[in-house]
Amino acid sequence: MSDFWVHLLVYLVILFGFVIVSVLLFIWLERRFIGRFQLRPGPNRAGPFGLLQPIADAIKVLIKEDIIPTESDKGVFWLAPLVAFVPVMLMFAAIPFADGAMLVDLNIGILYILAVSSVTVIGIFMAGWSSNSKYSLLGAMRTIAQEVSYEIPLVLSILGVVMLTGSLSMNEIVKAQSVPFVLLQPLGFFVYLSAAMAEINRTPFDLLEAESEIIAGFHTEYSGMKFGLFYLMEYAEVLAISAIATTLFLGGWQGPLLHPVIWFITKVLIIFMFIIWVRATIPRLRIDQVMAFGWKFLLPLSLANLVITAFEILAAPDMNTAVLIGINIAVMFGLILLFSRFYKLGGGRVSVK
């Protein structure tokens, strides 16, 4: 029994260290690449290539004064960062970095991840409500609206993968991918990545902390370590959705020659680079556009993906893989083009009475 607890403690320390180091690396990579996209060098003073800049920023946040608003609900205000941060860390318990390299191999792993990830929004709402600030509360309400709008297409996109594998275990889903599911489920991958970016409030869906509208949104009144926890939470969520996308659609740790962990990290970095590219390319949407995109565009596409997956399983179980991949990619582009004709993003002036 003692050996079990020792192994558990060691794995938890390694996992926590991996997440923290990855978050610091992600922050540095994002700032460097955003700088390149904007024709500037990015951070390049603190250490070689600016590698020490995230560490310097972390130290700065830790020594900042911890300010608590006078009229805030102090207990809830203090607890909110923990309620938001801890569930994100718990998500990594069921993500396999290699065959069996996970804290616990749950037979309902993906269901566990979806359930735990939903708790984060409670922490965000606690922060917005307890701050006694209209900007914080507005940011929190936007979070609730986005969570409701994008959780459904997110779950439906994952359901397509579950239908192909017949398992909810993350480890079994990876082993079932003799061909990466991004080729067999291209539409599901598109819906998952779009909905996941909206759920973690990345550009162009970053309305809950839109600086030009509501200052910093739900964490406007936070400073010091509490603000640092929210900042860590945001980038840990990016790492989590990249790891989940890698597991469900990119074959997880599988790949030739290199060590499985190296393959896993490489695929996670590819997803993260794509998220950075989207941030540097697409402007922030309005709140009505974000809601419409989820309900009028992603939800029908996710339902269509389920119907297509069910048809392929029942009617064409022995179809040549290359032909199936070609059909799926063609259907994906066709459906996106079709629904984009019906769905209008909106724009121009909006009259306010």
UniProtKB/Swiss-Prot annotation:
Main location class: membrane
Catalyzed reactions: a quinone + NADH + 5 H(+)(in) = a quinol + NAD(+) + 4 H(+)(out)
Compartments where found: Cell membrane
Protein's UniProt keywords contain DNA damage: no
EC number: 7.1.1.-
Keyword Transcription regulation: no
Entry's Gene Ontology molecular function annotations: NADH dehydrogenase activity; oxidoreductase activity, acting on NAD(P)H, quinone or similar compound as acceptor; quinone binding
Biological processes, Gene Ontology terms: aerobic respiration
Pfam families the UniProt entry points to: NADHdh
Its membrane topology: Multi-pass membrane protein
Cross-referenced InterPro entries: NADH_UbQ_OxRdtase_su1/FPO, NADH_UbQ_OxRdtase_su1_CS
GO CC annotations on file: plasma membrane
Keywords (A to Z) from UniProt: Cell membrane, Membrane, NAD, Quinone, Translocase, Transmembrane, Transmembrane helix, Ubiquinone
Transmembrane domains' residue ranges: 8-28, 75-95, 108-128, 148-168, 178-198, 229-249, 258-278, 297-317, 319-339
Top-level class of the enzyme under EC nomenclature: translocase
The protein's assembly and partners: NDH-1 is composed of 14 different subunits. Subunits NuoA, H, J, K, L, M, N constitute the membrane sector of the complex.
Family membership noted in the UniProt record: Belongs to the complex I subunit 1 family.
Biological role stated in the UniProt entry: NDH-1 shuttles electrons from NADH, via FMN and iron-sulfur (Fe-S) centers, to quinones in the respiratory chain. The immediate electron acceptor for the enzyme in this species is believed to be ubiquinone. Couples the redox reaction to proton translocation (for every two electrons transferred, four hydrogen ions are translocated across the cytoplasmic membrane), and thus conserves the redox energy in a proton gradient. This subunit may bind ubiquinone.
Protein name: NADH-quinone oxidoreductase subunit H
